[in-house]
């Protein structure tokens, strides 16, 4: 079965999960029309309380816009549609840190944000309340759906009237950055701030400039396994028998996947496969591979044929050859015992489907195995992010909203506040959180911008992975055919 089914599941999944969504370079291509949305509606509101987060989305079409002068004075107070504003509240906070003092000058200003629904998400409301009380700001909200925002953000930037905050995913970030839709925010974010140091700012740092802040919590991929099923079939527990004994690598992982692949009495009909995932790139990333990487000259280069990447592709090929890779819907398959293990992020693997409660079987969690080309564990991550659009009227306000949103996510990872604690436990249990926290003390985060190349997500990506998963071609053959395609996509993206 082609992996597009997994992709569609992923898109539906992202749009339903409640997560807070959410580099100067040359621009190429024609400029988009200098027009804003005629159908968007803005409304100002005063927020009193909130307790959750917003959704995220994916978009693939290339977006280009010319660099235009900052029009903060010319467009002050302008927006799309009907506008009202919030009331400024008296601050009960003391601004003690360097970062907070940098935001102190925001008092009395208005921050323009967009919402995908008629009202801001609960997560946005919580951040808005904090900022109203802390910095004395006002908010202007504009209804702008995720898909609509991705097609119109470039237009609004070119017209000089974008919102102060935008969101992108790994599928969009690189193109937004090189199209000059996102602007550097180094002047607004203090990198050595206590919370900023935990925000993985390197993800959206390109050419030593910060263009965005990762959003959402629990961004890492883990291996979930059906502990009940493992016990029934006498399989070794990967956490206690491999990871804790420092014997968790690509060889032991492959052997476990093979032994966790079982057949019916006829010896031919598959009962369940060892592992399933939609994101085959994690096999490269757990070995430090990223497919493309900075070239040290302001651009990127294709490294899909380097040892770290090739070892990841080989592991995928070996799983396919052993019939140990489940290629159906691995989320449903995990619940229905069709794949004994699932590789995903906590909110997507567990929280989205309420599997801690819906599955009768006990669920185990273990970090991904250590790759053969690295000396320590590498943890694959993917995350959406917030950015400040070029020509935003209040870039400092946008950066403040981004910072406070990411800070709120970090706080909620270990909060004891009842509502947020309940939500966290729906995504990751206390037991699994303890495993995660200990693991992250030494694991190296790995992320890739390969997914953000023009034309990659919408078609070329599936062609690459299907050559291994469906056609069962060896990695060397696949790389020979795909390297040129990656180079072309890279050129279209960054020039």
Task: Give, region by region, the residue ranges found by the protein language model.
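A structural signal for short loop-to-beta-strand junctions that line the ligand-binding cleft
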Residues: 102, 154-156, 163-164, 193-230, ...
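Extracytoplasmic/periplasmic solute-binding protein
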Residues: 206-221, 231, 246-301
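Conserved C-terminal helix/tail region of periplasmic/extracytoplasmic solute-binding proteins
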Residues: 51-92, 390, 395, 409-495
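Glycine-centered hinge/linker elements that transmit conformational signals in sensory
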Residues: 254-257, 294-328
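Extracytoplasmic/periplasmic substrate-recognition and gating elements
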Residues: 355-419
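Extracytoplasmic "Venus flytrap"/periplasmic binding protein-like
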Residues: 129-197, 210, 232-233, 238, ...
């Amino acid at each position: 079965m082609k992996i597009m089914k997994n992709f569609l599941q992923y898109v539906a999944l992202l749009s339903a999960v409640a997560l807070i969504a959410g580099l100067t370079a040359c621009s190429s291509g024609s400029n988009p029309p200098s027009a804003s949305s005629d159908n968007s509606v803005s409304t100002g509101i005063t927020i009193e309380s909130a307790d959750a987060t917003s959704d995220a989305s994916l978009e693939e079409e290339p977006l280009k816009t010319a660099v235009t002068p900052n029009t903060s004075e010319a467009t002050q107070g302008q927006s799309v549609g009907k506008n009202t504003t919030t009331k400024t509240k008296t601050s009960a906070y003391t601004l003690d840190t360097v970062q907070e003092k940098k935001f102190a000058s925001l008092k009395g200003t208005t921050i323009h944000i967009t919402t995908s629904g008629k009202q801001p998400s609960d997560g946005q409301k919580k951040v808005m309340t904090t900022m109203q009380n802390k910095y004395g700001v006002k908010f202007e909200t504009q209804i702008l759906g995720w898909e609509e925002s991705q097609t119109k953000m470039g237009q609004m930037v070119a017209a000089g009237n974008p919102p102060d905050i935008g969101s992108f995913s790994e599928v969009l970030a690189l193109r937004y950055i090189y199209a000059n839709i996102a602007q550097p925010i180094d002047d607004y974010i203090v990198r050595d701030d206590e919370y900023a140091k935990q925000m993985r700012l390197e993800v959206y740092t390109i050419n030593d400039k910060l263009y965005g802040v990762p959003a959402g919590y629990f961004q890492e991929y883990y291996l979930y396994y059906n502990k009940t099923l493992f016990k029934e079939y006498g399989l070794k527990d990967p956490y206690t028998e491999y990871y804790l004994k420092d014997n968790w690598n690509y060889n032991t992982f492959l052997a476990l996947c093979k032994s966790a692949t079982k057949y019916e009495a006829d010896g031919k009909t598959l009962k369940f496969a060892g592992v399933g995932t939609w994101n085959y790139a994690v096999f490269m990333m757990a070995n430090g591979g990223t497919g493309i990487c900075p070239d040290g000259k302001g651009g990127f280069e294709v490294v899909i044929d380097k040892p770290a990447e090739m070892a990841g592709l080989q592991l995928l090929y070996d799983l396919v050859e052993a019939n140990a890779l489940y290629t159906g819907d691995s989320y449903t398959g995990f619940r229905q015992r069709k794949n004994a293990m699932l590789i995903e992020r906590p909110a997507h693997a567990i929280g989205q489907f309420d599997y801690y409660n819906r599955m009768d079987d006990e669920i185990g969690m273990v970090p991904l195995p250590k790759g053969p080309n690295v000396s320590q564990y590498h943890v694959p991550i993917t995350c959406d992010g917030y950015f400040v659009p070029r020509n935003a009227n209040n870039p400092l306000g946008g950066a403040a909203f981004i910072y406070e949103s990411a800070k709120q996510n970090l706080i909620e990872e270990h909060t004891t506040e009842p509502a947020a604690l309940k939500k966290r436990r729906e995504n990751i249990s206390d037991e699994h959180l303890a495993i995660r926290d200990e693991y992250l003390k030494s694991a190296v985060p790995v992320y890739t911008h390969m997914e953000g190349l023009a034309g990659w997500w919408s078609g070329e990506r599936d062609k690459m992975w299907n050559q291994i998963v469906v056609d069962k071609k060896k990695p060397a053959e696949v790389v020979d055919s795909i390297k040129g395609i990656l180079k072309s996509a890279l050129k279209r993206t960054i020039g």
